[in-house]
Amino acid sequence: MTDITTKPDAAGTDLYALQLSLQREVNSRIAANAKDEGSRPQAFLVCDFEYLFRRDAHDAWCYVRGAECDDRGSVKVPKIKWPFHTIAAVSWMIMQFDGHSAIPHIEPPVVMTLADHDEIDILRALFAALDALGETGRMVTWGGEVRDLAVLRFKACRYGLPMPLHLHDTSPYARERIDLCRAVTVQADPVHLDEYAAGAGIPSKPSPAKEIGKLVEAGEFDLVHDHVLADVLTTSIIAMRWLAAKGEISCDRGRGAMAVSDVSAAAFPDSKFLAGNFRPWARDELRRSRLAGRVYRIEEIA
């Protein structure tokens, strides 16, 4: 087999010239596409979910199936997997980048819970938002490929709802979606949303992640509401940073954070997470982005 990556003798001059020409064309197209990616209008729907376990249905399945024991003879307690999950809360927010302004257009976030809506109404509203986003817009989650998307497809089948285009391609690398957890992790150890956020200095989760299921089952939907909203705000900031670092969008991170903060606070003025955590952080981000050089915090100097 001839290696055309090395310069051939005179007999292969034409082939070598063709190879160089093709390489230049490919490199030119890649550079042009990268430039166009950041300058064309783009839209992203960032979403997050919380669940309520259908324990009665799961217990019935376990009873019919029969108990399973481990090597010591102890009965195993089966994990309640996604076919037995009810969507208890969902939040989403749409970010639009026109390719020219450094400030994204942020649509007011939406939060829906079982306190005010049936599950099928929650699904219809989310699916309608995805349909309105269009085929060029992308759905953004943190770890959505692991559970959330499976639940959405399952519920669409259960209720007879047409799935939005963003759920059709079942590949975890589908162009219509971004799983940020998978994207930033690649082959490294997977991390939780609040774990990544803590490392990046972004506020997250007003309630401990392990407690949210208990809050759902206790019907504490005011706390659940703030929690799922917080997850979307955190994920949105991570998404903006990730997309900007890849050159897919052009965005001023300080003003982008303030845009998310201002729109969200106007939509949910009573949110404790926004008032106590996110808005002070966003203002700090804006101040820091306007200063040149190193910005020292009091706790860093002490």
Model-identified regions with their sequence ranges:
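DEDD superfamily 3′-5′ metal-dependent exonuclease/proofreading module
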Residues: M1-A302
